[in-house]
């Protein structure tokens, strides 16, 4: 890749982790530990690149376009184990939490472990109303708890009924809050309207493929419009309209 510097990004409220990393890094090396504000979605790769280097990945571009590569810490550990120890990726750490979880914790589990087994390990104070693969903002609801942990499962969120609210898909009131909170500086309300009308050229013009599906727009929407689901559908519309790749 031709990269000569490495930055390890850690949220600034993880002081123990920052101290531990600095203790094991040669101060004369090209590896630095960067303490970044604990705000969401700071961990998205384009946000990390801008926060650490000041470079902005162009719309539709990849980190390589600005001379960067971003790797999750878990991925780096898996690469190390595979290359240096000859160990395949057979386990991963999964954060299990939620409002009805009795003992929230990080668990090192074999890939293939069912979500049911995770629920039994942490305990819950009532029957789960909704189980998400992922966190509360970007997680995807699961309808069958026999689904397994995969290499991409980083969290399981278990919610009770009190955190459920009905989504009636009312009309947008054009308050503009979704645009204020979008970390990619997109126009969610315009994208939502374009998706509902099936206007693929407009979706492309609005840069819907740059949406990182962080959920900030849906979280702040006073009309409780399911914006993220709409944008996922819109992105699929755009991809379906693209010419097939050669080769």
Give the positions of each predicted feature.
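Short alpha-helical segments in extracytoplasmic peptidoglycan/chitin-binding modules
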Residues: 112, 117-119, 131, 182, ...
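Hydrophobic alpha-helical positions that pack around
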Residues: 4-115, 121-126, 135
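Alpha-helical scaffold segments in soluble metabolic enzymes
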Residues: 20-23, 78-82, 117-121, 177, ...
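Histidine-anchored nucleotide/phosphate-binding helix
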Residues: 1
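Ferredoxin-type iron-sulfur electron-transfer modules in oxidoreductases and energy-metabolism complexes
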Residues: 153-169, 179, 183-247
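Acidic, glycine-rich active-site loops and adjacent beta-strand->loop/helix elements
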Residues: 12-14, 135-138, 196, 238
């Amino acid at each position: 890749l031709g990269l000569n510097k490495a930055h390890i990004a850690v949220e600034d409220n993880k002081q123990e982790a920052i101290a531990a990393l600095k203790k094991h890094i040669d101060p004369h090396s090209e590896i630095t530990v960067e303490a970044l504000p604990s705000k969401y979605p700071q961990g998205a790769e384009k946000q990390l690149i801008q926060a650490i280097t000041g470079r902005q990945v162009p719309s539709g571009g990849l980190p390589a376009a600005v001379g960067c590569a971003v790797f999750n810490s878990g991925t780096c550990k898996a690469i190390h184990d595979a290359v240096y120890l000859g160990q395949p990726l057979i386990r991963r750490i999964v954060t299990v939490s939620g409002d009805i979880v009795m003992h929230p914790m990080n668990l090192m589990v074999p890939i293939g472990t069912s979500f049911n087994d995770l629920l039994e390990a942490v305990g819950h104070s009532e029957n789960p109303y909704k189980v998400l693969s992922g966190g509360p903002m970007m997680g995807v609801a699961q309808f069958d708890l026999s689904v397994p942990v995969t290499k991409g499962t980083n969290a399981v969120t278990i919610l009770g009924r009190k955190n459920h609210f009905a989504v009636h898909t009312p009309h947008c009131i054009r308050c503009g809050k979704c645009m204020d909170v979008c970390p990619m500086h997109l126009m969610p309300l315009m994208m939502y309207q374009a998706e509902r009308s099936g206007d693929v050229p407009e979706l492309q013009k609005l840069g819907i493929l740059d949406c990182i599906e962080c959920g900030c727009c849906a979280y702040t929407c006073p009309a409780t419009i399911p914006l993220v689901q709409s944008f996922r559908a819109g992105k699929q519309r755009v991809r379906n309209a693209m010419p097939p790749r050669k080769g």
